[in-house]
Amino acid sequence: MPGRTRRDGGSESGGKDRRDRRDGGRGGAAQEKTPQFERVVTINRVAKVVKGGRRFSFTALVVVGDGDGMVGVGYGKAKEVPAAIAKGVEEAKKNFFRVPRLGGTITHPVQGEDAAGVVLLRPASAGTGVIAGGPVRAVLECAGVHDVLSKSLGSDNPINIVHATVAALKQLQRPEEVAARRGLPLEDVAPAFMLRARAGQGA
C-alpha cells in the first residue's frame, strides 16, 4: 500500500508539474511575442522528377512586419504548406529592416528594381490609403505604411514584385539624414507636408 500511495502521489504531482511547466511556457512565450502581421503572398507547388516518379513540395513567400516600421520577407520550402509558411515566417524575421516614415507615408518618391520587377512608390497625403496591388500592399501594410501611391512597371511575378518593393523601401532616407549629409538646413530638403505639420505643431 505505501508503494502504491507513492506511485499515485508521484504521478499526480508529476503530471501537475508538467502541466504547469507547459502552461507557463506557453504563457511566457505569448508575453514575449510582439504584435506582428503575417501575409502569405504566394504558394507554389514544385515537382522534382526522380527515378521513381515525381516528388511534390511547396514553396511559400511570406511577409512579416510589426506594423510600426519593421518588415521582412522570407521564402520557405517544405513538403506541406503549413511547414513551408512556417519556414518563410522564420526567414522573414531574420531579414527584418526598418522603413523610414513620416506620419503614415514614406519620406520621398523611390523606385526599386529586382530581376524583372520594377516598383514605383510615392508619398501620399493622410487619408489616401494604400493604393497598391496585392504583393506591394502586403509589404507596405506589414511595414506600417498607411498612405502611399504605387505602380508596378515591370514583371507581374509576385516574387519579383515583392523583392522590388523591398529594394525600394531600403532606399528610403529620413530628411534629417539627407540634410546632414549635404550640409543643408532641414527646411531645404524636407517635404512640404512635413514642414506644414511642424509649423502647425509650433502654432
Curated annotation (Swiss-Prot):
Family recorded in the similarity comment: Belongs to the universal ribosomal protein uS5 family.
Quaternary context: Part of the 30S ribosomal subunit. Contacts proteins S4 and S8.
Disulfide topology: none
Species name: Saccharopolyspora erythraea (strain ATCC 11635 / DSM 40517 / JCM 4748 / NBRC 13426 / NCIMB 8594 / NRRL 2338)
Residues spanning the membrane: none
Domain remark in the UniProt entry: The N-terminal domain interacts with the head of the 30S subunit; the C-terminal domain interacts with the body and contacts protein S4. The interaction surface between S4 and S5 is involved in control of translational fidelity.
GO cellular component: small ribosomal subunit
A single GO molecular function term of this UniProt record: structural constituent of ribosome
Alphabetized HAMAP family for the sequence: Ribosomal_uS5_B (MF_01307_B)
Signal peptide: none
Start and end residues of each S5 DRBM domain: 36-99
Gene (name only): rpsE
UniProt keyword annotations, A-Z: Ribonucleoprotein, Ribosomal protein, RNA-binding, rRNA-binding
Name recorded for this polypeptide: Small ribosomal subunit protein uS5
